[in-house]
Each structure stands twice: as structure tokens, then as C-alpha cells.
Design a protein with these regions (language model features):
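Short glycine/proline-enriched turns and hinge-like loops at secondary-structure junctions
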Residues: 67-71
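Short loop/beta submotifs within extracellular cysteine-rich repeat domains
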Residues: 65-66, 82
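Extracellular "spike/adhesin" assembly and maturation modules
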Residues: 1-63, 75, 79, 87-112
Length: 112
């Protein structure tokens, strides 16, 4: 059996697992970052100097700094650090900067 869900990479609890709260809290943290996706900006390449807790960005082709090596990812700032998720074709996101709804197609993010 896999140790996480297929689409959102939510961790499963293992039988007889110690400290189940850690795994459960990680799943809640991921859900909070991935569900009802509204991003500060799409195609972002430079992390903000002082991101707000919960800030989310769709990353562009050549991100720098803390985002280096995460091209095309979703960056989420939570609990004082960045974590990243790989969006799947069909995901929707609202871009706050342009007030546009986006859909991820095979060719990339595009306005709806």
C-alpha cells in the first residue's frame, strides 16, 4: 500500500503508527494549501521578502532563492517556511494579481 494519496500527496496513517497527530497535522496543512486555490501571483520567480502566512504562488520557469529548482510548482508559505506541490492538469487557481481564473492544461496555465 502506498504511504500517501495519489493526487494531493496526503499522508496515510500507518497501522500501529506512533505520533499519529504528526501525520494528521501534515495532511491538514497540505489540504489548507491546496484546496480553494487562490494565488498571490502566477509565473512568479522571486520569493517575497516577508511572505504572509498561507501565501501561495504559482512558480514560473526559472525561480530563484528559496524557490530555486521548483519551476512550475505551487509554493506555499506555512509555519515559517516554503513547501511545494506539483499541480496536475485540470487544476483551477484564482490569480489575485490579475483577478483571473486559471486552468492548468498540458501546455501550462491559461485563463478560463
Amino acid at each position: 500500500m502506498a504511504d500517501q494519496t495519489v493526487h494531493l500527496a496526503l499522508p496515510y496513517l500507518a497501522p500501529s503508527q506512533a505520533q499519529k497527530h504528526v501525520t494528521y497535522n501534515e495532511a491538514l496543512r497540505r489540504l489548507d494549501g491546496l484546496v480553494q486555490l487562490a494565488v498571490e501571483a502566477a509565473s512568479a520567480t522571486t520569493p517575497p521578502g516577508a511572505p504572509a502566512e498561507g501565501a501561495r504562488y504559482l512558480l514560473g520557469a526559472s525561480p530563484t532563492g528559496a524557490w530555486a529548482g521548483q519551476a512550475g510548482a505551487l509554493a506555499v508559505f506555512a509555519d515559517g517556511s516554503w513547501w511545494f506541490a506539483t499541480p496536475e492538469v485540470g487544476w483551477l487557481a484564482y490569480d489575485k494579481a490579475t483577478e483571473t481564473v486559471l486552468v492548468l492544461k498540458a501546455a501550462g496555465w491559461t485563463g478560463v
